[in-house]
Structure formats: structure tokens, C-alpha cells
Amino acid sequence: MRPSGRRPDQLRRIAFTCNYTKHAEGSVLVEFGDTRVICTASVEERVPPFLKGKGSGWITAEYGMLPRATHERTGREAARGKQGGRTMEIQRLIGRSLRAALNLEALGERTVTLDCDVIQADGGTRTASITGGYVALVLAVQRLLKSRKIKTNPVHGQIASVSVGICQGVPVLDLDYAEDCDAETDMNVVMNDAGAFIEIQGTAEGHAFRRDELDAMLRLAEAGIADLLLHQQEALDGCGIKS
């Protein structure tokens, strides 16, 4: 039995609150159980220097946690004067994943920045950020379409992410903090709605995992992401948007 009482193949409660903030072109509060992340998508009419004059847009991301998002207060990285390696790794992952959802040329020479701010952490903050970030990105794109800044919808694929792992010898889906701490293997998977993999990050913590265990985890991830895609669609449908 998992600490939460869930089945091995069961997601936590998933919820999206769209248009959560006032000013951003797209925003959502995403909840994976007790993990809560505010994702905002901000559009700027410029691109990084390496893309100037090339007719292509860009998607990037920043990630952070409130000091008391965790069990004990964690000092702000800004106060230390630099970002930690974990933060940089996660925000690069978010950016890479969400770039796979768009035709960047159809976006035009503009940048969309996804800010993913964890207000409460209970495992899976990066997967929640990617899954919620997609919803915020679609909302921002709809704003661009309505204002006629772009002519065609650049979104060509739906993206979601989930964690899987092996806990006490059993492959499980969507690990919370308690499971993440004790997991023998921890893996983050990003997929699109075509069933293709965008990124797989996996590490053996307690002991090496076998090929059959890897296959079992990937099957769990595929099923979990299929459910997450439906949750995303329902949230966007509630805003009158067909993703």
C-alpha cells in the first residue's frame, strides 16, 4: 500500500485553475495532489540575439520555489546571488518540453516566457510545471490569435509530464514527496498527444533497475500522461478553447 493509499497506477488529484493571475497573457494554478504551482506565460515582442532576423519565435522558462513551499524554509536564491544547479536543470527541462508543442516560426519573432513558481511542494514539481505550463502557453497563444498578432495557431501538439518510480519493489505512478524520498528508482517522463516521448530522466537511487522494470514504469507513464492530457483538455474546454 502506498503512503497515500493510492493504487500503483493512480494519479493524485489533478486540478487546473485557468486565468489565475490578472496581468499575464496566460496563467494557471496547477495542482498535483498537494503540489501547487502557478504557471504564467508572458509574451514579449523580441527574441534572443541568436534568433534576430530569422523569423522564428522562442519559448523559455524560469522556475522557482517560495521559501516555505517545503517542510522547512529554504532561503531565496536571489538572496544568495545565484541560481542553484537543480533550478537551472528544471527550467531548461520545462523550456525544452514546451518548445516541442509549438511551431516556432508560426509564433513570429516573439518570446514566450513561462514562469513556474512552486507555492507548495509535495513531489513532482517539475512535472506539474510542464503540465501546467502547457495550459498557460495555450492561453497566451489564444490571446495572440484574438489580437491578430499571429494568423495561424502555432500549437501543433499537446504536452504533459509525470513521474514514475519503483518503491519497495513496485513500479508506481506520480510520486509524492514521501515516496520520492524512499524510491529505489525515480524517473520523469514528458510525452506528447501522439504518444511520442520528448524526454525521459531516470536515476537508480537504491539499486540498478532492470529492463522489465523500465518497461513497466514507461507503461505507467504513458497511461498517466494520457489521463493528464484529458485533464488539460477539460480545463481548456472550460475556457472555450479547443486544444
Swiss-Prot record:
Keywords: Nucleotidyltransferase, RNA-binding, rRNA processing, Transferase, tRNA processing, tRNA-binding. The lineage of its organism: Bacteria, Pseudomonadati, Pseudomonadota, Gammaproteobacteria, Methylococcales. It comes from Methylococcus capsulatus (strain ATCC 33009 / NCIMB 11132 / Bath). Phosphorolytic 3'-5' exoribonuclease that plays an important role in tRNA 3'-end maturation. Removes nucleotide residues following the 3'-CCA terminus of tRNAs; can also add nucleotides to the ends of RNA molecules by using nucleoside diphosphates as substrates, but this may not be physiologically important. Probably plays a role in initiation of 16S rRNA degradation (leading to ribosome degradation) during starvation. Gene3D superfamilies: GHMP Kinase, N-terminal domain. It is an enzyme of class 2 (transferase). Phosphate binds at residues 86, 124-126. This is Ribonuclease PH. Pfam families: RNase_PH (PF01138), RNase_PH_C (PF03725). Homohexameric ring arranged as a trimer of dimers. GO terms for molecular function: 3'-5'-RNA exonuclease activity; tRNA binding; tRNA nucleotidyltransferase activity.
